[in-house]
Curated annotation (Swiss-Prot):
InterPro entries: GHMP_kinase_C_dom (IPR013750), GHMP_kinase_C_sf (IPR036554), GHMP_kinase_N_dom (IPR006204), GHMP_knse_ATP-bd_CS (IPR006203), Homoserine_kinase (IPR000870), Ribosomal_Su5_D2-typ_SF (IPR020568), Ribsml_uS5_D2-typ_fold_subgr (IPR014721)
Name the UniProt record assigns to this protein: Homoserine kinase
Catalytic activity field: L-homoserine + ATP = O-phospho-L-homoserine + ADP + H(+)
Keywords: Amino-acid biosynthesis, ATP-binding, Cytoplasm, Kinase, Nucleotide-binding, Threonine biosynthesis, Transferase
E.C. code: 2.7.1.39
Record keyword Glycoprotein present: no
Length: 293
């Protein structure tokens, strides 16, 4: 069996914990029954022992199978392309992939809602797992332990230019930097900007995104711990990025632009930040896929 799951970028400025989109950079997971348990990891995380001994994919996969009475062993080849602990949804890709794979082996019908709400057990914020399951741009929240979400597709004439620093940022640790309370003014600012940004994406009003993607809840505090991120954002917006936001909790930075502007934006960012990876990516509208039964 082969299952693939895309990278994601969440928050997108004002949409803290509720907005996210999918990027066409896929982890592929190859699973087959075996007499013994075996894991091989290729790509991102390769050669790091903890990703083999404490692997979230195999943990979730086996837990679901055992819950349904299957105690078999499997051989896993995990082909990782999504950077790990860089704010591009690597954990969500693993969790969603594990859930989809386990359900397929159990003979369950392919049901994205079922996959999503099972993934929520292991990842309690919907902003990454929802686009990982559905693809596209998603707005989501959790009510009564269930994800409520809507998706819209992202057109092919838009590209993502991702800047991926060589610095790990833990989502859990970065959350401790954030205030426990926000003022009415800050809350209204983010609510209004997230709402209008979503309408702009649905209606194709791309030139509104620069204004709508501003944030007062989380980005500044997180970016202060790694000030070069301010320079990335400034340079991107000076070179035709439609929007430029911290990807998840970082350290990656998400930039959206028109297709014709992507090569120059990549060139400018690569020249200014030669030690960082800069990648032009298509958006993904498919989400998790069973590529081979």
């Amino acid at each position: 069996m082969v299952v693939s799951v895309p990278a994601t970028s969440a928050n997108l400025g004002p949409g803290f914990d509720c907005l996210g989109l999918s990027l066409n950079l896929r982890n592929r997971f190859f699973i087959e029954p075996s007499n013994i348990h075996a894991v091989k990891l290729v790509g991102e995380g390769e050669g790091i022992p903890k990703f083999l001994t404490n692997n979230i994919f195999t943990k979730v996969f086996y837990e679901i199978l055992k819950k349904h009475g299957n105690d078999g062993s499997f051989k896993f080849l995990l082909h990782n392309k999504v950077p790990i602990t860089r704010g591009m949804g690597s954990s969500s890709a693993m969790i969603v992939g594990a859930v989809a794979s386990a359900f397929a082996f159990l003979g369950f019908a392919f049901d994205r809602e079922n996959i999503l709400n099972t993934a929520l057990i292991y990842e309690n914020h919907p902003d990454n797992i929802t686009p990982a399951v559905f693809g596209g741009y998603n707005a989501a929240f959790v009510e009564k332990k269930k994800v409520i979400s809507l998706k819209t597709k992202i057109p092919s004439f838009l590209k993502a230019v991702m800047v991926i620093p060589n610095r790990v940022i833990s989502t859990k640790q970065s959350r401790h930097l954030l205030p426990k309370r926000y003022s009415v003014q800050e809350s209204v600012f983010n609510l209004s900007h997230a709402s209008l940004m979503t309408m702009a994406i649905v209606q194709g009003k791309w030139d509104l995104l620069r204004c709508c993607s501003k944030d007062r809840m989380h980005q500044y505090k997180r970016m202060q711990t790694y000030p070069v991120l301010f320079a990335i954002q400034k340079l991107a917006l000076e070179n035709n990025a439609l929007m430029s936001t911290l990807s998840g909790s970082g350290s990656s930075f998400f930039n959206m632009c028109y297709e014709e502007d992507a090569p120059k934006l990549k060139q400018v960012l690569s020249k200014k930040f030669p030690k960082f990876r800069v990648a032009v990516l298509d958006f993904d509208n498919d989400g998790v896929l069973i590529e081979k039964d």
